[in-house]
Regions:
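Short acidic DE-rich linear segments
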Residues: 92-97
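Negatively charged, low-complexity tracts enriched in Asp/Glu with abundant Ser/Thr
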Residues: 1-22
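Acidic, low-complexity, intrinsically disordered interaction modules
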Residues: 26-86
């Protein structure tokens, strides 16, 4: 991952949101969150065109009763053109909002 360490990026996802640029688009990772009413952890990733004001669509969403499971799925599910996060992170640039 350009502009940061992958381990730090992943650690941050457990406490906050993060963004990356990949293939010319901006992707906003909503960190692992907990829904008190439903007693579920959840996360999602939104795709934007050039900047945070040009929302395109949600590309990923996952819910679980377990925080670690939620993070594992976020990183290992194949929603990046049939690849998982670990397979494409080397082409991503960590960016500030």
């Amino acid at each position: 991952m350009e502009a940061g360490k992958i381990t730090e990026f992943i650690d941050n996802l457990t406490i906050q949101d993060e963004m990356v640029r990949y293939k010319g688009n901006l992707y906003y990772f909503y960190g692992i969150r907990f829904d008190e009413e439903r007693h579920l952890y959840y996360t999602s990733v939104d795709k934007f065109r050039n900047n945070i004001n040009e929302f395109e669509r949600e590309i990923y969403r996952y819910e679980s009763t377990d925080m670690s499971d939620c993070l594992d799925h976020l990183l290992e599910d194949k929603y990046w053109d049939g690849k998982c996060f670990y397979e494409v992170e080397k082409f991503m640039k960590w960016v500030d909002g």
